[in-house]
Swiss-Prot record:
Coiled coil stretches, renumbered: 66-330
Naturally occurring in which organism (per UniProt): Neisseria meningitidis serogroup B (strain ATCC BAA-335 / MC58)
Metal-binding keyword on record: no
Protein name from the UniProt record: DNA recombination protein RmuC homolog
Example GO biological process: DNA recombination
Stated family: Belongs to the RmuC family.
Leader sequence residues: none
Domain of life according to the entry: Bacteria
Amino acid sequence: MELMTVLLPLAALVSGVLFTWLLMKGRFQGEFAGLNAHLAEKAARCDFVEQAHGKTVSELAVLDGKYRHLQDENYALGNRFSAAEKQIAHLQEKEAESARLKQSYIELQEKAQGLAVENERLATQLGQERKAFADQYALERQIRQRIETDLEESRQTVRDVQNDLSDVGNRFAAAEKQIAHLQEKEAEAERLRQSHTELQEKAQGLAVENERLATQIEQERLASEEKLSLLGEARKSLSDQFQNLANTILEEKSRRFTEQNREQLHQVLNPLNERIHGFGELVKQTYDKESRERLTLENELKRLQGLNAQLHSEAKALTNALTGTQNKVQGNWGEMILETVLENSGLQKGREYVVQAASVRKEEDGGTRRLQPDVLVNLPDNKQIVIDSKVSLTAYVRYTQAADADTAARELAAHVASIRAHMKGLSLKDYTDLEGVNTLDFVFMFIPVEPAYLLALQNDAGLFQECFDKRIMLVGPSTLLATLRTVANIWRNEQQNQNALAIADEGGKLYDKFVGFVQTLESVGKGIDQAQSSFQTAFKQLAEGRGNLVGRAEKLRLLGVKAGKQLQRDLVERSNETTALSESLEYAAEDEAV
């Protein structure tokens, strides 16, 4: 029996592992290595923060222990003083010194209170330091988020600049028709390249700033730890000083008491009577106070008794509702527990799982049957997991309340039979043939009460195999939560893979766009060179060489052509110089020919 108790939970665990293997077979083998490294880095950072937090908590616990030890010493000192008072009651001749001892005790109490106030102040300061450390950690996260936001804005700016560069390419294409604006377009392209360079420098500066802030936060954390250490040492020093002061005062008072007790005996009797009378009044006041407090406690106990009765009645009503004949109430409760497990798994409702999704299944006679599983959990590659909640509480509750072994065995058999009946009913629904739903080979039958689930598996070794043969996976809250978290992890990996593909696609498009821009820019350069060559040829025809247009036009003006404007002097002089040079070269050539 003990072996079965061990093997059945192990079988449930093996079933969970088997399902996980069915889900993850052939997928994500390469991606898990990178994910595990990333998670390890995150876990290392979390461990570092948790270690720092644990160290601070342990130091606070040590300080609290020292403070309690100080209170115990104070209490022990009070006990010693009480013993001294009893001794004074038996020795009237020592009453005078008793008064001084009481005065000393009062002073010690005042000092103890002062130390307690100081300890509270130190504890408050420690709490503030701890809060400051938490605020610094939160500030670090905010700074990192802000830096990531700035980097994303920088990337967006770079993309905008790249789009602007593409526009520049179009402008250069239009520049072939507008040669007069070529130089302005080239300056604009240079300005955009400088802007791109400045953005890259800004991104590098943000990265350096991030490293500086991380270093600053680490330094502040070390400073906080040093402050905590100094506060602990100060508290220990104060505790030692208080103990030494108490011992010194007690020794001094004891010595003075031995020297002066006989001389002041006659001054003690009257104050002693007054103190005894005051003590009686104090006892009376204490008794009255205890009576009032006892009455208050009695009223509070009556109120608690009423609340207990109310809770008992409400618990009984809930038990009756869940174990009665109202199966709808049990079903609603089971669905509520199932949805709670889904919310804690990390899956998002409406996207990664759907509640009460209606579907249709075709029957063998050609008709259709409408089915509505409790939950459909979506998987990558358009697959789904069907989860149906089944509540078996009536027999289980009677089993827990059984007064003898025979009744317990009978109710246990009824409990297992109830689960088996739910399993057979679920297998008849055959959720695997639903239209529009690509389910796995298994349907999850969820039992919301973990002890009831484990009790059935422990006492019926064939129940799990019988469910498995009918393609039903019997799960409780713990096993279902582990499976759903595995599904959530699969979705995260799928999202990362989709993001990686999108990044690769965008990178390819960006590279193609960059190649096109380079080709366009080369064409623009060739056009600029060609335009420059054409410009030089046209300018030579205009103002250089023999018979140029400027020289001919200037001759017409000199011959008396009326004109309201004149050509620029330097252009005319250049035309004359080139004309004279051309003529001299022609004469030289003729002389050589002669």
